[in-house]
Swiss-Prot record:
Compartment list: Nucleus; Chromosome
Disordered as annotated region, ranges: 286-379
Sorted UniProt keywords: Chaperone, Chromosome, DNA-binding, Nucleus, Transcription, Transcription regulation
Bias type Basic and acidic residues, positions: 370-379
Alphabetical list of InterPro entries matching this protein: PH-like_dom_sf, RTT106/SPT16-like_middle_dom, RTT106/SSRP1_HistChap/FACT, Rtt106_N, Rtt106_PH
Molecular function, one GO term: double-stranded DNA binding
Name of protein: Histone chaperone RTT106
Annotated Acidic residues bias: 328-344, 352-368
Length: 421
């Protein structure tokens, strides 16, 4: 039996069981309704107690906007009012039919940030976003509400706050901003401000949640599905870009507390705006940090060395110079050393042995030529291996490389004429 049923009054519980007939899907719907009610109750408990009378009187009212859709901390239509509290200080009061449901008192000290934000893809709607703190310095869920521009224009005209023939919603925004200033706080309008740094927003995902990332002059906001994230620009220590594709990329914000927040599936067309924002706010871009670059650099170095070794081996196959050194000069020098070593090792110095060597060379000239060529190839391999600094090469088949590895045994028996004890 679902846990929420145990928290219902007995009579309500019996009715739910009777209607659902223990059907899991129907019980699931009832559970969602129950949880929704709990969230609203929790939000009301978190709401700041008002300093106004139980019912709002006209004498306490400074400004009121009716039938505004609230999305946070509660979801319902309420009236937004600026009033004078019992302590004589202005307060924001959210009420239904003049009955307060929540309020933010002492606006000058409570409101930390407020701004009008565009509603993506719906030009007829506008967000009002308010971040505030309580007297105990707690940070409740921010206030988020939407305004229908046409509905607000009509209310302002009916109250005579703007000319009847006006269709400029900006006049309504200006009026509300002035009222806020008079009562101790400011409402920013960053997307209409042509003097300061430009504000912009991008669509993205955080995990499975789709939302909007707002880049404001001094804040970054992700919303508006709970939890709503608000960052002050000076709280962000660094930023990284990752998962970059032809169409999208990811952004990770790292705070000074080393908390990481990744936002994915951002359109590539927004990269220039985000990068400019990062530079303007002097945020560190750690996308090319050493720890991220280390592996690609090592891999590229290894690939480069292997390519050089393969090229040297190809040159050996084609009997071409390796590393810019002529093969002929190396062969002559090597041959000279080889002959001198042969003479020193021969203790008799008799002409008969030299004659026998010449006879052997005359009778089998082709064998001697092949042996000398094998010696050259052997020494060239040693040079290439030394230049590569003991780099491990892929295995090559001797027959494929055209190299006889057992060179010295053939030289000792046929080419040198040297006898060993």
């Amino acid at each position: 039996m679902p846990e929420f049923l145990e928290r219902l009054p007995h009579a309500v519980k019996q009715k739910v069981l009777q209607i659902s007939n223990n059907d899991a899907k129907i019980l699931g719907v009832f559970e969602q309704v129950f949880q929704c009610g709990q969230e609203n109750q929790d939000a009301r408990r978190k709401a700041v107690k008002t300093g106004v009378s139980e019912r709002l009187e006209d004498s306490e009212l400074i400004f009121e906007l009716r039938d505004v859709s609230f999305l946070s901390p509660i979801r319902k239509k309420l009236n937004l009012a600026i009033t004078i509290g019992s302590d004589g200080k202005p307060a924001l009061l959210f009420n239904k039919d003049r009955v307060p449901e929540m309020a933010i008192p002492n606006l000058q000290e409570s409101v930390k940030f407020a701004a009008f934000l565009p509603f993506p893809e719906k030009k007829n709607l506008l967000y009002l976003f308010i971040v505030y703190r309580t007297a105990s310095d707690e940070a409740p869920d921010p206030v988020l509400l939407t305004m229908n521009k046409e509905g607000v224009l009509k209310q302002f005209k009916d109250k005579g706050l703007i000319p009847v023939d006006s269709s400029n919603f900006g006049e309504c925004v200006d009026y509300m901003r002035k009222q806020a200033i008079l009562t101790g706080f400011r409402i920013g309008d960053p997307f209409s401000n042509s003097q300061g740094p430009p504000a912009f927003h991008v669509e993205c995902h955080r995990g499975t949640k789709e939302g909007t990332l707002y880049f404001l002059p001094d804040h970054i906001i992700f919303g508006f599905k709970k939890p709503i994230l608000v960052f002050e620009s000076n709280e962000i220590e660094s930023i990284t870009y990752s998962s970059i594709t032809r169409l999208t990329f990811n952004v990770t914000l790292i705070t000074k507390n080393q908390e990481k927040y990744e936002f994915s599936m951002i359109d590539q067309s927004e990269f220039a705006n985000i990068d400019e924002y990062v530079k303007r706010n002097q945020v560190k871009d750690k996308s090319m940090s050493d720890e991220l670059k280390a592996k690609p650099m090592v891999k590229a170095h290894q690939v480069g060395e292997q390519s050089a070794l393969k090229e040297a081996q190809q040159q050996l196959r084609e009997n071409r110079p390796t590393g810019g050194v002529p093969i002929d000069s190396d062969d002559e020098e090597a041959d000279g050393n080889f002959e001198s070593e042969s003479e020193l090792s021969d203790g008799s110095g008799s002409d008969s042995e030299a004659d026998s060597d010449e006879d052997a060379d005359d009778t089998d000239d082709s064998d001697g030529t092949n042996d000398t060529h094998d010696v050259l190839q052997h020494e060239e391999i040693q040079i290439a291996a030394a230049d590569a600094e003991d780099e491990v090469l892929p295995d090559f088949d001797q027959a494929e490389a055209g190299i006889d590895i057992v060179i010295e045994e053939d030289d000792e028996e046929e080419g040198s004429g040297v006898e060993y004890d």
